[in-house]
Protein backbone atom coordinates (compact mmCIF):
# COMPACT_ATOMS: atom_id res chain seq x y z
CA UNK A 1 0.00 0.00 0.00
CA UNK A 2 1.11 3.55 -0.71
CA UNK A 3 0.81 4.45 2.95
CA UNK A 4 3.94 2.39 3.62
CA UNK A 5 5.94 4.84 1.49
CA UNK A 6 4.76 7.72 3.66
CA UNK A 7 5.51 5.54 6.69
CA UNK A 8 9.14 5.16 5.61
CA UNK A 9 9.45 8.92 5.26
CA UNK A 10 7.93 9.49 8.69
CA UNK A 11 10.11 6.80 10.24
CA UNK A 12 13.22 8.41 8.76
CA UNK A 13 12.28 11.79 10.20
CA UNK A 14 11.56 10.34 13.63
CA UNK A 15 14.80 8.34 13.54
CA UNK A 16 16.83 11.44 12.79
CA UNK A 17 15.11 13.31 15.62
CA UNK A 18 15.82 10.44 18.01
CA UNK A 19 19.46 10.31 16.95
CA UNK A 20 19.98 14.04 17.45
CA UNK A 21 18.29 13.87 20.85
CA UNK A 22 20.44 10.92 21.91
CA UNK A 23 23.67 12.66 20.90
CA UNK A 24 22.83 15.86 22.73
CA UNK A 25 21.60 14.17 25.89
CA UNK A 26 24.32 11.53 26.26
CA UNK A 27 27.53 13.32 25.34
CA UNK A 28 29.09 12.73 28.77
CA UNK A 29 28.40 9.06 29.42
CA UNK A 30 29.58 5.78 27.96
CA UNK A 31 26.15 4.25 27.51
CA UNK A 32 25.23 3.52 23.90
CA UNK A 33 21.79 3.13 22.45
CA UNK A 34 21.17 0.64 19.67
CA UNK A 35 18.85 2.76 17.53
CA UNK A 36 18.02 -0.19 15.31
CA UNK A 37 16.37 -1.87 18.30
CA UNK A 38 13.90 1.00 18.38
CA UNK A 39 12.81 0.56 14.76
CA UNK A 40 10.05 -2.01 15.41
CA UNK A 41 8.66 0.17 18.19
CA UNK A 42 8.76 3.31 16.08
CA UNK A 43 7.31 1.46 13.12
CA UNK A 44 4.42 0.18 15.24
CA UNK A 45 3.77 3.65 16.66
CA UNK A 46 3.78 5.25 13.23
CA UNK A 47 1.58 2.50 11.80
CA UNK A 48 -0.90 3.06 14.61
CA UNK A 49 -0.81 6.81 14.01
CA UNK A 50 -1.50 6.32 10.31
CA UNK A 51 -4.15 3.62 10.77
CA UNK A 52 -5.95 5.26 13.69
CA UNK A 53 -5.56 8.95 12.88
CA UNK A 54 -4.44 9.79 9.34
CA UNK A 55 -6.48 7.32 7.31
CA UNK A 56 -9.74 7.71 9.29
CA UNK A 57 -9.46 11.50 8.97
CA UNK A 58 -9.14 11.26 5.20
CA UNK A 59 -11.94 8.66 5.11
CA UNK A 60 -14.19 11.12 6.92
CA UNK A 61 -13.13 14.00 4.71
CA UNK A 62 -13.78 12.07 1.50
CA UNK A 63 -17.24 11.01 2.64
CA UNK A 64 -18.14 14.57 3.63
CA UNK A 65 -16.78 16.13 0.44
CA UNK A 66 -18.93 13.65 -1.51
CA UNK A 67 -21.88 14.88 0.58
CA UNK A 68 -20.91 18.43 -0.34
CA UNK A 69 -20.73 17.51 -4.02
CA UNK A 70 -24.17 15.91 -3.80
CA UNK A 71 -25.67 19.01 -2.19
CA UNK A 72 -24.06 21.28 -4.78
CA UNK A 73 -25.27 19.05 -7.62
CA UNK A 74 -28.87 19.27 -6.39
CA UNK A 75 -28.65 23.07 -6.40
CA UNK A 76 -26.80 23.19 -9.73
CA UNK A 77 -29.32 20.97 -11.51
CA UNK A 78 -32.36 22.77 -10.12
CA UNK A 79 -34.03 25.06 -12.62
CA UNK A 80 -34.77 27.42 -9.76
CA UNK A 81 -32.40 26.99 -6.83
CA UNK A 82 -33.88 27.50 -3.37
CA UNK A 83 -32.55 28.98 -0.14
CA UNK A 84 -32.89 25.58 1.52
CA UNK A 85 -30.64 24.08 -1.15
CA UNK A 86 -28.00 26.75 -0.61
CA UNK A 87 -28.28 26.32 3.16
CA UNK A 88 -27.67 22.59 2.68
CA UNK A 89 -24.57 23.36 0.61
CA UNK A 90 -23.26 25.66 3.36
CA UNK A 91 -23.90 23.04 6.05
CA UNK A 92 -22.11 20.41 3.95
CA UNK A 93 -19.17 22.79 3.43
CA UNK A 94 -18.83 23.23 7.19
CA UNK A 95 -18.95 19.46 7.74
CA UNK A 96 -16.31 18.82 5.08
CA UNK A 97 -14.08 21.56 6.41
CA UNK A 98 -13.79 19.96 9.87
CA UNK A 99 -11.76 16.86 8.89
CA UNK A 100 -9.61 18.95 6.56
CA UNK A 101 -8.65 21.21 9.45
CA UNK A 102 -7.84 18.14 11.55
CA UNK A 103 -5.61 16.87 8.74
CA UNK A 104 -3.50 20.02 8.88
CA UNK A 105 -1.52 18.26 11.60
CA UNK A 106 -0.11 15.83 9.01
CA UNK A 107 0.24 17.65 5.72
CA UNK A 108 3.45 15.81 4.79
CA UNK A 109 3.40 13.17 2.06
CA UNK A 110 0.84 13.51 -0.75
CA UNK A 111 -0.67 16.79 0.45
CA UNK A 112 2.72 18.49 0.14
CA UNK A 113 4.38 16.41 -2.58
CA UNK A 114 1.61 16.88 -5.14
CA UNK A 115 0.53 20.42 -4.12
CA UNK A 116 -2.86 19.16 -2.97
CA UNK A 117 -2.71 21.32 0.16
CA UNK A 118 -2.51 24.66 -1.70
CA UNK A 119 -5.09 23.47 -4.22
CA UNK A 120 -7.53 22.77 -1.39
CA UNK A 121 -6.69 25.59 0.98
CA UNK A 122 -4.89 28.53 -0.65
CA UNK A 123 -5.31 31.88 1.04
CA UNK A 124 -5.70 34.71 0.20
CA UNK A 125 -7.96 34.26 -2.78
CA UNK A 126 -7.49 35.98 -6.11
CA UNK A 127 -10.88 37.66 -5.94
CA UNK A 128 -10.07 39.83 -8.96
CA UNK A 129 -9.68 36.81 -11.23
CA UNK A 130 -12.66 35.03 -9.67
CA UNK A 131 -14.89 38.00 -10.40
CA UNK A 132 -13.34 38.47 -13.84
CA UNK A 133 -14.24 34.90 -14.76
CA UNK A 134 -17.75 35.27 -13.38
CA UNK A 135 -18.26 38.45 -15.41
CA UNK A 136 -16.80 37.00 -18.61
CA UNK A 137 -18.29 34.75 -21.27
CA UNK A 138 -15.63 32.06 -20.78
CA UNK A 139 -16.81 28.48 -20.38
CA UNK A 140 -16.40 27.77 -16.66
CA UNK A 141 -16.58 24.01 -17.23
CA UNK A 142 -13.41 24.18 -19.32
CA UNK A 143 -11.38 26.19 -16.81
CA UNK A 144 -8.23 24.90 -15.19
CA UNK A 145 -8.62 26.62 -11.85
CA UNK A 146 -5.53 28.16 -10.28
CA UNK A 147 -4.81 27.35 -6.64
CA UNK A 148 -6.03 30.75 -5.46
CA UNK A 149 -9.23 30.42 -7.52
CA UNK A 150 -10.31 27.07 -6.12
CA UNK A 151 -10.54 25.01 -2.95
CA UNK A 152 -12.41 25.49 0.29
CA UNK A 153 -11.92 29.24 0.54
CA UNK A 154 -13.11 29.99 -2.99
CA UNK A 155 -16.24 27.97 -2.35
CA UNK A 156 -16.67 29.74 0.97
CA UNK A 157 -16.43 33.10 -0.79
CA UNK A 158 -19.14 32.08 -3.26
CA UNK A 159 -21.69 30.62 -0.83
CA UNK A 160 -21.22 32.62 2.39
CA UNK A 161 -21.45 36.30 3.25
CA UNK A 162 -20.29 37.50 6.66
CA UNK A 163 -20.30 33.94 7.97
CA UNK A 164 -23.86 33.16 6.90
CA UNK A 165 -25.31 31.55 3.77
CA UNK A 166 -25.83 34.10 1.03
CA UNK A 167 -29.33 35.01 -0.06
CA UNK A 168 -30.15 32.64 -2.91
CA UNK A 169 -31.47 35.58 -4.93
CA UNK A 170 -27.91 36.96 -5.07
CA UNK A 171 -26.52 33.78 -6.67
CA UNK A 172 -26.39 34.18 -10.45
CA UNK A 173 -26.40 31.29 -12.90
CA UNK A 174 -22.68 31.92 -13.49
CA UNK A 175 -21.97 31.79 -9.76
CA UNK A 176 -23.96 28.58 -9.47
CA UNK A 177 -21.89 27.11 -12.29
CA UNK A 178 -18.64 28.22 -10.65
CA UNK A 179 -19.80 26.69 -7.35
CA UNK A 180 -20.42 23.38 -9.10
CA UNK A 181 -17.10 23.14 -10.93
CA UNK A 182 -14.95 24.40 -8.07
CA UNK A 183 -16.60 21.78 -5.83
CA UNK A 184 -15.88 19.15 -8.45
CA UNK A 185 -12.19 20.11 -8.39
CA UNK A 186 -12.23 20.03 -4.59
CA UNK A 187 -13.65 16.51 -4.80
CA UNK A 188 -10.98 15.45 -7.31
CA UNK A 189 -8.25 16.71 -4.98
CA UNK A 190 -9.83 15.02 -1.96
CA UNK A 191 -10.23 11.65 -3.65
CA UNK A 192 -6.67 11.80 -4.94
CA UNK A 193 -5.36 12.66 -1.47
CA UNK A 194 -7.32 9.74 -0.01
CA UNK A 195 -6.12 7.34 -2.71
CA UNK A 196 -2.47 8.38 -2.38
CA UNK A 197 -2.56 7.38 1.29
CA UNK A 198 -4.63 4.21 0.91
CA UNK A 199 -3.20 2.98 -2.39
CA UNK A 200 -4.98 2.13 -5.63
CA UNK A 201 -5.91 -1.36 -4.43
CA UNK A 202 -8.08 0.20 -1.74
CA UNK A 203 -10.30 1.95 -4.30
CA UNK A 204 -13.48 -0.11 -4.05
CA UNK A 205 -16.21 2.52 -4.07
CA UNK A 206 -17.71 2.71 -7.56
CA UNK A 207 -18.12 6.47 -7.44
CA UNK A 208 -14.47 6.94 -6.49
CA UNK A 209 -13.33 4.61 -9.27
CA UNK A 210 -15.49 6.34 -11.88
CA UNK A 211 -14.33 9.78 -10.74
CA UNK A 212 -10.67 8.78 -10.97
CA UNK A 213 -11.20 7.32 -14.45
CA UNK A 214 -13.46 10.03 -15.87
CA UNK A 215 -11.43 12.95 -14.53
CA UNK A 216 -8.14 11.23 -15.39
CA UNK A 217 -6.79 11.53 -11.86
CA UNK A 218 -3.29 10.09 -11.59
CA UNK A 219 -2.43 8.20 -8.41
CA UNK A 220 1.32 8.68 -8.41
CA UNK A 221 2.65 7.38 -5.11
CA UNK A 222 6.39 7.62 -4.56
Language-model-derived ranges and their functions:
Residues 15-45:
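Bacterial Sec-dependent N-terminal signal peptides
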Residues 33-222:
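Mature extracytoplasmic or organellar-lumen-exposed domains after removal of signal/transit peptides
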Amino acid sequence: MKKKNWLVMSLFISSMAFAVSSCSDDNNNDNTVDDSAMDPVKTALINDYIDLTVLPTYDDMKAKVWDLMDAVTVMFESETATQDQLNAVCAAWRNAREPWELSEGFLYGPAANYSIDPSLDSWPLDQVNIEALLNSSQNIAEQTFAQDNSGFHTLEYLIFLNGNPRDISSISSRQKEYIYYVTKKLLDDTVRLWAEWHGEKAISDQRDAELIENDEITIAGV
